[in-house]
């Protein structure tokens, strides 16, 4: 009898929860319409994979790419609408969040064609790969619009779990397993520290979880200058630092870059930084409004360490992927300058602009690495010697992307850094900008060293990998070259016409 009553209560409670969720989705679903498109794409992928006897791979790519493009279209149609807070304060929709969601969707859209040939050559399971990519994209999009502590924790966990699975996708590779283990352990530790910081914020504000309500709660409780807020600030900085991977929270980055499948590295190298940057700007700017001097100092230290260590250690690397790992650590130091400058001096606009260029530069470089790796099976920098003699298009594409990453004019990377450093200088961050300029010069050195190998490799320096280089005849070859071409164009042409991009970025401010 007691069991029967308990069972009835459980059914009633479950029904209430389901009805409440259905009510929220019915009345607030339009506010997350781009996310709903991705969810529908995920369901469609699962249905086709479980019901079709003959796996028709082009359909999986088509469904994934179409859902991403449709989601981008839905975002563009919603541009410049009034800011809206939905789902009982859990989710906020405004231009600032949507531009970061657009960047994440753009990354995923470019990464899928980039990975087609790799998946065919390595015979990886295509459905699971696309499911993890779309789910990680969904988690990143929810993180960009998260407006309370619970959503800010759950959304990156959705992204992180898919990232762990993607990084260990080649199960037979010892390096991949080692990278996944390190990534998983450090990711779990950072999530624990992040939640610890959230608990201090929650307690100090009198039990508030929404970002703006936390500020009001801190004013009411007079706890905005308490030691608890300092503990929360340090803990949250460490937690977010793992996602952004600045020094000294970068230990996982080189191993994961080297051990994971290259298309996965391309995806993680940009999407994780875009989503974490969006979250960091909101967390530091709103709940820690009264501790701006403290978090400015913390981020300045992280930026300086990242720019110095990332670029200096990159010089000594012999693997292309490890070199790009340390390069990305240096690049995030430049992005942090925009976060510190904030809204007052176009800091966020400069950060968004540089992020857009960084996506094209980084993905273009990885597209070249994927293409070269599939033809030769090597990742060593010296094995690129003389590539121009065998594949001029690939060599020129890689050279342009590397030059843009280094910030040489008139490429997009130069104007992105120029705008970022100018905003930092206007805000009085003279030492930080000076370090950025010096480390940019250092980065140009190791990029030019690779370009010299590509273009001027002598006959005795050309390795058997390039000497026996053969272009692929697979039908999917066009897809990776398509991604490569788009990224190369985006790394060069925007440097000539910057005004429209800056105008769009400046419209995304709070």
UniProtKB/Swiss-Prot annotation:
Transmembrane segments: 24-44, 59-79, 99-119, 124-144, 149-169, 183-203, 229-249, 295-315, 323-343, 354-374, 395-415, 418-438, 484-504
Keyword NADP: yes
Catalytic activity: a plastoquinone + NADH + (n+1) H(+)(in) = a plastoquinol + NAD(+) + n H(+)(out); a plastoquinone + NADPH + (n+1) H(+)(in) = a plastoquinol + NADP(+) + n H(+)(out)
Membrane topology: Multi-pass membrane protein
InterPro entries for this protein: NADH-Q_OxRdtase_suN/2, ND/Mrp_TM, Ndh2_N
GO cellular component terms given for this protein: chloroplast thylakoid membrane
One Pfam short name: Ndh2_N
Entry's Gene Ontology BP terms: ATP synthesis coupled electron transport; photosynthesis, light reaction
GO MF terms, alphabetically ordered: NADH dehydrogenase (ubiquinone) activity; quinone binding
EC number: 7.1.1.-
Protein location: Plastid, Chloroplast thylakoid membrane
Class of the enzyme per the UniProt entry, highest EC level: translocase
Sorted UniProt keywords: Chloroplast, Membrane, NAD, NADP, Plastid, Plastoquinone, Quinone, Thylakoid, Translocase, Transmembrane, Transmembrane helix, Transport
Record carries keyword Transmembrane: yes
Sequence similarity: Belongs to the complex I subunit 2 family.
Chain's role: NDH shuttles electrons from NAD(P)H:plastoquinone, via FMN and iron-sulfur (Fe-S) centers, to quinones in the photosynthetic chain and possibly in a chloroplast respiratory chain. The immediate electron acceptor for the enzyme in this species is believed to be plastoquinone. Couples the redox reaction to proton translocation, and thus conserves the redox energy in a proton gradient.
Quaternary organization: NDH is composed of at least 16 different subunits, 5 of which are encoded in the nucleus.
Protein name, as recorded: NAD(P)H-quinone oxidoreductase subunit 2, chloroplastic
Source species: Sisyrinchium montanum
